């Protein structure tokens, strides 16, 4: 239907061959390929511990469990994000405090909103690196420490992003990445959790596999044949098939980033002359993954005409995102003027 899609998975012949090799190996579940994929990410981020899981949402849920969010707790989240960010908080029984973004130029959780929304019930902050950008991350990290709050980075958009030569995903207590098919690299479904906290890492390893003390691959390669269950865990494992695709995709990740950057520069060059269009992040200093390219069209009639005209040319567009507090489940009368203006 579309000549140009909003996103499409770039699956090469090499990707297919590597996955087929794993299919022939007779080990399909979580095993050596998952371990290899985790090691690649640990080296890439310069972080001590990586755990591969079944999705970015699973990563967020496990991160929230590590922080022991529970009933009566509050966790500050941005209004401009995919719903999984808030859902992961709700899974624990805690309440997501949906907060406004910084500005039309920087679509990131506002540090002033964070300050305003901190209460005696606040236990954590989840910052979303929207479109692969961040803003005030160093100050937000300091603020979290000042108030003894956990900081989780939702880095689903931020594969390869960095700020001040430090990878996004290494500023908080935990960080969650997603490899959904529309992301910069894909495993079909999947994600990883990054942390430097050994206790968190060990808890994640247990929780992702039903709370078991050993994993199938470990038992296969040792004399240990039994296990204990010491947590109420989940089936959040990544399998070796998906990890194999991730390993292959990983090798082209930097080249993909350069290509995206060139496209962003071209789009900006062509669109900056139109007063009806606003382009965010023009002065933002993040070395971005350029996950998505976002524009604002203030006139709603013009916006719909642009969408229709592009559709007629078989060019797909998308809306990222409806603010959380506008969904039926999270409906709120709270006024969040900046995110409401940009949406």
Positions of predicted regions on the chain:
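Conserved coil-to-alpha-helix start sites within the AMP-binding
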Residues: 81-86
């Amino acid at each position: 239907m579309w000549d140009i899609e909003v996103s499409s998975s770039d699956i090469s012949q090499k990707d297919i061959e590597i996955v087929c090799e794993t299919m022939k190996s007779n080990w399909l579940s979580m095993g050596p390929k998952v371990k290899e994929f985790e090691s690649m990410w640990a080296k890439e981020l310069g972080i001590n511990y990586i755990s591969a899981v079944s999705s970015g949402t699973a990563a967020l849920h496990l991160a929230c469990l590590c922080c022991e969010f529970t009933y009566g707790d509050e966790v500050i989240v941005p209004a401009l994000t995919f719903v999984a960010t808030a859902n992961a908080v709700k899974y624990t029984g805690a309440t997501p405090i949906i907060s406004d973004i910084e500005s039309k130029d920087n679509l990131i959780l506002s540090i002033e909103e964070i300050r305003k929304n901190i209460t005696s019930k606040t236990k954590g902050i989840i910052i979303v690196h929207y479109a692969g950008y961040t803003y005030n991350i160093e100050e937000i990290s300091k603020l979290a420490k000042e108030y003894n709050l956990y900081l989780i980075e939702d880095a689903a958009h931020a594969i390869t992003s960095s700020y001040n030569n430090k990878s996004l995903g290494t500023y908080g207590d935990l960080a969650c990445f997603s490899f959904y098919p529309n992301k910069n690299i894909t495993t079909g479904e999947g994600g990883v959790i990054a942390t430097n906290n050994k206790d968190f890492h060990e808890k994640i390893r247990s929780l992702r596999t039903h709370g078991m003390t050993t994993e199938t691959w470990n038992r296969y390669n040792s004399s240990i044949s039994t296990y204990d269950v010491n947590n109420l865990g989940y089936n959040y494992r990544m399998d070796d098939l998906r990890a194999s695709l991730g390993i292959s995709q990983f090798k082209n990740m930097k080249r993909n980033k350069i290509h995206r950057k060139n496209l962003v520069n071209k789009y900006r060059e062509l669109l900056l002359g139109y007063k009806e269009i606003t382009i965010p992040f023009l002065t933002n200093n993040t070395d971005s993954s350029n996950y998505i390219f976002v524009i604002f069209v203030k006139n709603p009639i013009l916006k719909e005409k642009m969408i229709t005209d592009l559709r007629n040319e078989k060019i797909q567009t998308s809306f990222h995102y409806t603010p959380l507090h506008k969904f039926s489940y999270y409906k709120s009368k709270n006024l969040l003027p900046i995110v409401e203006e940009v949406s």
